[in-house]
């Protein structure tokens, strides 16, 4: 009755169906099915607002209006286990517990620690949860934990995909390489700015070519300025050599049995090389969870937003929700279509496509042709 009074039957447009189940110890458990979702009366949902130093925990059942049993503990999975043991003294040993926390600084570590003790755990994607944080005027750890618990209970969230250990290690390695790439970009900017402040300007065709680097090494600014430039160039050389070594290691990782076929297929596309292909594979994981390309684009935050009301239609830029790393790589890859030529494939692209099936190559070429024609008629992508 309490469920019907809350209007859930109207929301799902279906008549609720009740089940009475018998548990292992003879107790009775009740479950309701509405719109394909099974709500277990004997399930307790534990919301965890997790930080580096502390966890804020609370619990609620599906039929509860508010969460209860709030507790703030030091950041440790052992304290979560103690909290669950405390809840069992209240709800009984047969109670099913589902814990959840937002994707954030802890990554997958807390999830795996709890799973090792057979504790059911979910990582929630923040942008898909019941209540948008930006709309709230009061934000506390206690309220955050309650929102997580209620989202778990009412199934108003999307879970984060949990990668395999191999995928996660490969993902972290690639991100580490990209961090060094960002450092190299920064040191390049610092070198150019330093030279400009000292009155040196390169009049060649482009920066960071072999001729440009040779010109930088030939400069002889006065006094301590020479030592400063030498230190900058030393850092540049170290980072360049390290990136070459890391890129070679990524090539080795991509040649593993679990990755080689998928990487080979993805590199058939214009603008996608081994680094981007392997990043997409290990970051996304299971592509089968996306029923369409539109859903995948939404996951990456590449679909346009909208702020409309009544007859007013106001289109926004891309939502930028989801995986920032993959979105940046694919946006960079898309720039290749602004420079490609219709009907022409470079020697490098032909070498990447070599050895793949004709169906894969034809599909990649068709996609490239479509986008190149679109660029030809509409300008920049």
Pin down the residues of each PLM region.
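Intrinsically disordered, low-complexity and often Lys/Arg-enriched segments
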Residues: 10-42
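Glycine-rich, often acidic, oxyanion-interacting loops/wings at catalytic, nucleic-acid
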Residues: 178-263
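Phosphate-backbone recognition surface of nucleic-acid-processing proteins
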Residues: 265-268, 274, 279-368
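Short alpha-helix plus adjacent loop in nuclease-associated cores
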Residues: 124-159, 312-320
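Nucleic-acid-processing active sites and adjacent nucleic-acid-binding tracks
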Residues: 64-94
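Single conserved hydrophobic/aromatic residue that forms the stacking wall/gate
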Residues: 1-15, 371-381
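Gly/Thr-rich phosphate-binding beta-strand-loop-beta motif of the actin/hexokinase/Hsp70
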Residues: 40-61, 148
């Amino acid at each position: 009755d309490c469920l019907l009074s809350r209007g859930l039957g109207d929301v799902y447009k279906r008549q609720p169906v009740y089940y009475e189940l018998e548990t292992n110890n003879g107790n009775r458990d009740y479950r309701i099915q509405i719109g394909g979702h099974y709500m277990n009366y004997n399930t307790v949902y534990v919301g965890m607002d997790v930080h580096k130093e502390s966890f804020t925990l609370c619990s609620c059942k599906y039929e509860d209006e508010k969460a209860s049993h709030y507790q703030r503990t030091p950041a440790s999975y052992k304290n979560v286990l103690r909290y669950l043991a405390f809840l069992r003294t209240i709800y009984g040993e047969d109670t099913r517990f589902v814990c959840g926390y937002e994707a954030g600084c802890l990554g997958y570590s807390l999830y795996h620690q709890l799973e090792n003790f057979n504790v059911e755990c979910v990582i929630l994607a923040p942008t898909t949860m019941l209540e948008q944080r930006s709309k709230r005027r009061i934000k506390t750890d206690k309220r955050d934990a309650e929102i997580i618990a209620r989202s778990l209970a009412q199934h108003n969230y999307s879970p984060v995909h949990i990668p395999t250990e191999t995928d996660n290690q490969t993902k972290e390695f690639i991100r580490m390489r990209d961090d060094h790439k960002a450092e190299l970009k920064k040191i390049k900017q610092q070198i150019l700015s330093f030279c400009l402040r000292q009155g040196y300007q390169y009049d060649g065709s482009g920066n960071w070519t072999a001729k440009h680097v040779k010109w930088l090494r030939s400069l002889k600014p006065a006094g301590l300025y020479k030592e400063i430039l030498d230190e900058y160039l030393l850092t540049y050389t170290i980072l360049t050599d390290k990136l070459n070594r890391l890129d070679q290691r990524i090539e080795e990782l991509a040649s593993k049995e679990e990755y080689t076929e998928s990487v080979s297929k993805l590199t058939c596309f214009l603008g996608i090389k081994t680094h981007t292909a392997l990043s997409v594979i290990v970051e996304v994981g299971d592509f089968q969870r996306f029923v369409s390309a539109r859903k995948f684009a939404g996951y990456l935050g590449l679909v346009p937003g909208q702020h409309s009301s009544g007859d007013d239609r106001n289109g926004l830029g891309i939502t930028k929700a989801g995986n920032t790393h993959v979105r940046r790589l694919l946006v960079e890859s898309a720039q290749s279509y602004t420079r490609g030529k219709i009907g022409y494939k470079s020697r490098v692209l032909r070498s990447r496509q070599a050895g793949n099936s004709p169906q894969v190559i034809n599909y990649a070429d068709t996609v490239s042709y479509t986008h190149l024609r679109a660029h030809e008629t509409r300008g920049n992508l």
